[in-house]
């Protein structure tokens, strides 16, 4: 929904949703459970058209999807960062805490030793900021994207499913990574290469829309 129906209030039918989820091996019962949970959490709302249920994002769902969109679809960016070494007994500055007395900050901190971050962080620091399961997921996704064959001959259904799968997996990774320039994380998680692969494939699949889905 956040990829195909973020900018409008169009519904997606339960038939279409079941076709999409079946293509990736999700059973109808699991789809129903997921839809129920998303409705309960105020992400989705439903309506009956004839005998069939249709779903769309709620106002909350659209708002949160739009807020997350720059991180999911946008480029990385460069901005100055400092490693602030401060008194562990004092209040921590606003930033990304690595250890007691050590924090990544967006501006120099008074009373701290501020070291401009010109190089990637060592892997042990990246490990403090990004969980191992996220780093493993990023590596795994990048490897799989590199092995994708030509996608020009895919059917409309396959193109929709491929795009949604890429967005889903990338979203689960990038939203659990600190919002810092990709190069800061260095080899600890090869985010720059993965982002380039994701953006390339999403550009190739940029023609995918609800119009294609409705025609399935």
What kind of region is each of these model predictions?
Residues 88-169:
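Mid-protein regulatory/catalytic core that forms ligand/cofactor-binding pockets
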Residues 8-20:
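Short acidic, hydrophobic short linear motifs in intrinsically disordered regions
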């Amino acid at each position: 929904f956040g990829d195909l129906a973020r900018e409008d209030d169009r519904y997606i039918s339960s038939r279409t949703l079941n076709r999409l989820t079946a293509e990736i091996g999700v059973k109808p019962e699991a789809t129903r459970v997921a839809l129920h949970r998303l409705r309960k959490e105020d992400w989705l709302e439903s309506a009956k058209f004839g005998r069939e249920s249709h779903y769309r994002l709620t106002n909350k769902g659209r708002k949160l999807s739009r807020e997350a969109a720059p991180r999911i679809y946008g480029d990385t960016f460069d901005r100055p960062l400092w490693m602030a070494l401060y008194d562990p007994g004092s209040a921590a500055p606003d930033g990304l805490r690595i250890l007691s007395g050590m924090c990544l900050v967006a501006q120099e901190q008074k009373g701290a030793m501020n070291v401009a971050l010109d190089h990637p962080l060592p892997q042990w620091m990246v490990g403090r900021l990004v969980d191992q399961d996220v780093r493993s997921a990023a590596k795994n996704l990048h490897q799989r994207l590199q092995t994708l064959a030509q996608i020009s001959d895919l059917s409309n259904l396959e193109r929709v499913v491929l795009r949604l799968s890429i967005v889903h997996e990338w979203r689960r990774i990038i939203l659990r990574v600190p919002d810092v320039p990709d190069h800061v994380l260095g080899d600890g998680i090869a985010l720059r290469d993965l982002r380039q692969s994701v953006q390339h494939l999403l550009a190739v699949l940029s023609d995918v829309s609800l119009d294609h889905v409705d025609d399935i």
